Curated annotation (Swiss-Prot):
Entry-linked Gene3D superfamilies: Lactate dehydrogenase/glycoside hydrolase, family 4, C-terminal, NAD(P)-binding Rossmann-like Domain
Active site: H177 (proton acceptor)
Catalytic activity: (S)-malate + NAD(+) = oxaloacetate + NADH + H(+)
Protein's organism: Vibrio vulnificus (strain YJ016)
Lineage, opening ranks: Bacteria, Pseudomonadati, Pseudomonadota, Gammaproteobacteria, Vibrionales
Subunit structure: Homodimer.
Protein name: Malate dehydrogenase
Protein EC: 1.1.1.37
Amino acid sequence: MKVAVIGAAGGIGQALALLLKNRLPAGSDLALYDIAPVTPGVAADLSHIPTPVSIKGYAGEDPTPALEGADVVLISAGVARKPGMDRADLFNVNAGIVKSLAERIAVVCPNACIGIITNPVNTTVPIAAEVLKKAGVYDKRKLFGVTTLDVIRSETFVAELKGQDPGEVRVPVIGGHSGVTILPLLSQVEGVEFSDEEIAALTKRIQNAGTEVVEAKAGGGSATLSMGQAACRFGLALVKALQGEEVIEYAYVEGNGEHASFFAQPVKLGKEGVEEILPYGELSDFEKAALDGMLETLNGDIQIGVDFVK
């Protein structure tokens, strides 16, 4: 099993690479690519960790050697948020980066499962889809926006509020991956009751958690370490699924188009990527209103991505 991390010299990429070096199944190959010349050094550094995962690093303009033979490609390349920026401000730089990477993937490893971390995910995933469609290699079962960070934040914040073990808390999160499009389904958390005030406050905190970190880092970056953890969880889920295990995770995928052409929802993963898009259950009145209220934003984000490629 070969996993490629694209954008591996960045804050998310290095954290993700460290976690994968420690947690990928024995015999896996880990390829790191970044435009930054430090990347082979990041691989050399990680290669000293005594785990049965081989690692190579590649730098420069061409990601081809890292992508060759990849089963899973995790893309974290791009610029990070700074205070005062929202995820839309990232679009101007990151859209072009994702487009050119998708063009290479279409040629070099068109059958790989692709997990996109680069923000704004609501828009970068449709960009990748349009590029792959143009190349005639698009398989909607194999393209994912990684929204796992919203899930792990929700689990953490609920556990903190209710004094529970975060490893035991499960919170479904649907919609998109920025601001109001992030919708934690707190009504479905088992064994926990929330007041209306708690639901409103928790939902807002989960939606704004990225900004919380950007401001706390005071210009020194965005959420890189927790995102690395989230991306590792999702990447390992893909690896397990490709090896024949049945895994359920939440991801931003092309679904049946009920609400938007791309939507974060629970998916059953298997050897071909998405095996089945699962129902997300009954929504509370608060959640229904939040869902209705976000769709214009989410559909607008998606359209920006489609238009960018056309």
